Amino acid sequence: MPYEPPTHTVERSLRATTGAKIIAGVDEVGRGAWAGPVTVCAAITGLRRPPVGLTDSKLLTIKRRTELEVELRTWVTSYALGHASPEEIDAMGMTAALRLAAVRALGTLPVRPDAVILDGKHDYLGAPWRVRTVIKGDQSCIAVAAASVLAKVQRDKMMAELGVDHADFGFADNAGYPSPVHKAALEERGPTPHHRLSWAYLDALPQWRHLKKVRSWVEGSVPEIEGQLGFDF
């Protein structure tokens, strides 16, 4: 299937139908991971021409994704990241954790967006935000595609840092997602403080079941990676 670059079609539609001037694209990464936070990026891009090759982060090679992320950090008008920790995910469930991370990201932006374009079918953000959901928005919408790349690369960096003290789990390679190395380490060593104990696979490990919800999230264990704050509107 030939590459079709994302466009500003959704942004233009929102401007025309709602009067919104400042529109943020929002995407998440880490939803299906066994370990680490779920991360949401909110990116404001305006209507400028995007960097060449911008698309859903999952469709890019690691090399190209990393190069593009560097370019995006200075190309976007502004962006910010929000995280929900494994402990928060265990306590409230994924939908509420996604909302928490998204609210944190949007609240870190230098201005409040008039509208939000959310990747996917379901609106996990809700009122009071004006939300337009777009299936495969990370492929079709420029602002969401930018958020996708920024979120993915920066969460991957975060997981690599967390993996320094947990080398057997392969966080630098699997970013906390299921993998044979990750599975073997869990079965041998049990979960780290960065694991989601409510996830079905971890919950089913009988030798570690006594640890379920009996751990505290270590303050500052998730490295701070700030979003760029800009006012170039």
From Swiss-Prot:
Q: Which amino acids does the record list as binding a divalent metal cation?
A: 27-28, 119
What's the domain of life for this entry? Answer: Bacteria
Task: Domain (RNase H type-2): give its ranges.
Answer: 21-211
- Keywords linked to the UniProt accession: Cytoplasm, Endonuclease, Hydrolase, Manganese, Metal-binding, Nuclease
Q: What is its EC number?
A: 3.1.26.4
**Which terms does the UniProt entry file under GO BP?**
DNA replication, removal of RNA primer; mismatch repair
Has keyword Manganese? yes
GO molecular function per UniProt? manganese ion binding; RNA binding; RNA-DNA hybrid ribonuclease activity
Mostly located where?
Answer: cytoplasm
List the residue ranges forming a coiled coil, or say none.
Answer: none
| Entry GO terms, CC | cytoplasm; ribonuclease H2 complex
**Is Nuclease one of the keywords?**
yes
InterPro entries for the chain: RNase_HII, RNase_HII/HIII, RNase_HII/HIII_dom, RNaseH-like_sf, RNaseH_sf
The record's cofactor note says: Manganese or magnesium. Binds 1 divalent metal ion per monomer in the absence of substrate. May bind a second metal ion after substrate binding.
Where is this chain's protein located in or outside the cell? Answer: Cytoplasm
Q: Which Gene3D superfamilies match?
A: Ribonuclease H-like superfamily/Ribonuclease H (3.30.420.10)
Q: Which NCBIfam families match?
A: PRK00015.1-3
Q: Name the family.
A: Belongs to the RNase HII family.
Q: What is this protein for, i.e. what is its function?
A: Endonuclease that specifically degrades the RNA of RNA-DNA hybrids.
Protein name per Swiss-Prot or TrEMBL: Ribonuclease HII
Per the UniProt record, the source organism is: Streptomyces coelicolor (strain ATCC BAA-471 / A3(2) / M145)
Q: Which gene encodes it?
A: rnhB
